[in-house]
Structure formats: C-alpha cells, structure tokens
Amino acid sequence: MSDILKKIELYKREEIAAAKAAVSLADLKAMQAGQSAPRGFYQALTAKREAGHFGLIAEIKKASPSKGLIRPDFDPPALAKAYEAGGAACLSVLTDTPSFQGAPEFLTAARAACALPALRKDFMFETYQVHEARAWGADCILLIMASLTDDEAERLQDESFSLGMDVLVEVHDASEMERALKLSSPLIGINNRNLRTFEVGLTVSETLASMVPDDRLLVGESGIFTHADCKRLQAAGINTFLVGESLMRKDDVTAATRALLVGEAAIAAE
C-alpha cells in the first residue's frame, strides 16, 4: 500500500469509529428503509454499451489532494441535472471530506435531483461504510484493491450485493487486476493514475485491458479529457469512463459532457 493510502486509512479508521459511536447499524438500516430502491448502476452502463454508446460515470468532486479546489460554485443537484442532460449514464459523488471536501449530503442531494444511479466515491474499509452508502442513497460502492486484502474486498463486495448495490472494483496494475478478477463483480475500473507519483497515462488502461475476459465491464478512470481519449480507450476494448475534473472545470457542464461522449464534430453536424 502506498504512503498516501496508509495515511488515508488511518483517518478513515478514526472516522468510522466516530461514526459508529454516533449512528448505530440499526439506525443506518432504518435509514435504508426510507431510501428508494437501488437504481441499477451496472445495468445503466450495460444498457449504454448494448446501444452502441459510450457509458459515462460523471463525477461530482469539489476538490482533490493533487489539484486543490476544482469548482468554487459547487452545487451537487445542479451538476447532477447537467450531467444527466448531457447524456451521462451514472454519477460518482465524493463523500470523503479530508482529501476531497466531499460529504454524504452531496451524494443524497445529487441523486435526488436526477434519475441516474450513483456511486459513493470513498475509501471503503468496513462493512459499516457499505450500510452508510445505502442509507445515503448510493446504488454502488467503490473498492480500491490497493488498500484492501482479498478477504476484505470480498466481504465488502458481498455486503454491498446483499443490499442490492453494485460494486466498482478499482485497480492500478497487473497484480491488482489478477486479484480483482477473483471477485464476482463484473465492474472493473482501471485507474490511470500512479498512486505513488500521481502521474497519469492512458497506457495503463490499454495494457491492463487485455487481461480482462468479455464478461466484465471495464471502466477507464483518470486522465480522460476529450472524445479522442474515449476513442483511444475504445480501441483497447474500454467503452465506459469515469470522468470528473475535466467536466467540473467547464462553465457549461452539459455541453462539455455531450462533447466528451459524441465529439465536437458530431455536435456541429446536428
């Protein structure tokens, strides 16, 4: 595990302990009962693929450790609506506060503002967090293989499945991919960012994609800024993308989302 992830795990463990003391598991389950049913995150992405379209998981992210504040006028419901209007298939909403200035209420508010399924984007270590995710309205959780053992990942996956949620399993290299393929989740994200250097390169996705059987749905993550980037990854067998920063920085988020998915030329020809 990288030094960055070790530091994150330390504060997350403290956060989880404090959360458990404030809100019991029984309370979370009561909150889940008041939520609408999971919307089918994986299903929404496969529907795009089967229709011959790119599938976009559009991210709602206020800040990041490497870039600082990304969008000063941060309005999760408005962003969710803009992404939906632009053709996104799903949302990803940051709920981690120390590193990303995220919050649970951002997830709840964004999902309530649209019809898209939403991912709780956070660092997951305990099944309690899975129950939090569903209580807040999440339809999917993220598992970062670099920060989990195989047993931990499987336990979190199975807990998520038991609540009707999907699981996006994130990898950064070949050894993590081999571990991810042992899990039953069909959703595998390839993060193009090096966790040790923060450098980004699409060659990571292009290299690792060849390891994956056709029954899995691959998601390209990080370093995707243009329609040309999407086309490049499509050539490697990746038709689904998680994109945040490049869209969050645009004034017209809906137009930027459409341009990413279909290209400026297609829009100009309409």
Swiss-Prot record:
Entry keyword set: Amino-acid biosynthesis, Aromatic amino acid biosynthesis, Decarboxylase, Lyase, Tryptophan biosynthesis
Residues spanning the signal sequence: none
Xref: Pfam families: IGPS
GO terms, biological process: L-tryptophan biosynthetic process
GO molecular function annotations of the record: indole-3-glycerol-phosphate synthase activity; phosphoribosylanthranilate isomerase activity
Superkingdom, natural source: Bacteria
Pathway(s) served: Amino-acid biosynthesis; L-tryptophan biosynthesis; L-tryptophan from chorismate: step 4/5
Matching SUPFAM superfamilies: Ribulose-phoshate binding barrel
Top-level EC class as recorded in UniProt: lyase
Reactions mediated catalytically: 1-(2-carboxyphenylamino)-1-deoxy-D-ribulose 5-phosphate + H(+) = (1S,2R)-1-C-(indol-3-yl)glycerol 3-phosphate + CO2 + H2O
EC numbers: 4.1.1.48
Family statement drawn from the similarity comment of this UniProt entry: Belongs to the TrpC family.
Record's protein name: Indole-3-glycerol phosphate synthase
Encoding gene per record: trpC
